[in-house]
Structures are given as structure tokens and as C-alpha cells.
């Protein structure tokens, strides 16, 4: 089953993306480089739980 997750910017801007991932195929925390419009750069986004 796919689980909803939140990708939080490592630039400490408070910006985040929401997405889903398959926990069986990717048991580790997801890290992906995406665009942060607040700082206008590509930065690392790390997985966090949706509250």
C-alpha cells in the first residue's frame, strides 16, 4: 500500500512537497533534490511524516 509522505526542504525555508511512496519497495527515508521556490534553487528534500 502506498503511504502519503511530506518532503521538507533542507534549506530551512518551511517549504514542502507532498507525495506517496511504497513502503515495501523503499523502506528507507526518501531524499531527493527538488526546486525550492523560496530560495530559487534546487535543494535536498527529506522525508517527514504528515501531521
Curated annotation (Swiss-Prot):
GO biological process: translation
GO cellular component: cytosolic large ribosomal subunit
Keyword terms of this UniProt record: Ribonucleoprotein, Ribosomal protein
InterPro entries (UniProt xref): Ribosomal_bL33, Ribosomal_bL33_CS, Ribosomal_bL33_sf, Ribosomal_zn-bd
Superkingdom assignment: Bacteria
GO molecular function per UniProt: structural constituent of ribosome
Any Pfam family hit: Ribosomal_L33
Alphabetized HAMAP family for the sequence: Ribosomal_bL33 (MF_00294)
Similarity-based family: Belongs to the bacterial ribosomal protein bL33 family.
Protein name per Swiss-Prot or TrEMBL: Large ribosomal subunit protein bL33
Originating organism: Francisella tularensis subsp. holarctica (strain LVS)
